[in-house]
Amino acid sequence: GVFRRQRQMCIRDRYNVGDGIRMATDMGASTKGNWSGCHAVGWERNAPEFGDLAVGDAFQKHSYPFGIMVNATGRRFVDEGADFRNYTYAKYGRVILNQPNQFAWQIFDQKVTHLLRDEYRIKQVTKVTANTIEELSTKLEGVDPTAFVDEISKWNKAVRTDVPFNPNVKDGRSTNGLNIPK
């Protein structure tokens, strides 16, 4: 983004410091493009700092349309089902970077676990399970548990059950009355 060249202002890994761009501009190259944007993806919170060839890109997490995402305040912050993941993953990756503490938990129930991509099945994935929402709220590291329970309660009441779920199309299954619809 625009702050890539200002190390103290930058959201990035420690290796992305703009050296290549600086070398090119020092030699006369001009810069173009979207300096205020980025192509980010939702990534495993506890992934290593640099690549693991055995894992490849399995640290990415793109099954969010089948669940919800919550931030540190315990609240949803995006319409996870606005479109298919191919059209939203980079946009939502950036949105996650703008959340408090730059993370989000993805929440799924047992009805959709068979739909999750293989990247959710690697042994390095951070995963917690619980028998109740209250129990889950205590296991989500960095999340306000009281707000999370409230958010899930509102979510569960808002989900339309009169429309059959079909994961292969925009089926019209949605919510009613939430600040951020799905």
Segments (PLM) and residue ranges:
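Single conserved hydrophobic/aromatic residue that forms the stacking wall/gate
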Residues: 1-11
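Extended, hydrophobic alpha-helical segments in both membrane/secreted and soluble proteins
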Residues: 5, 19-20
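Mobile, glycine/GP-rich and aromatic-enriched active-site lid/loop segments adjacent to catalytic centers
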Residues: 14-17, 25-182
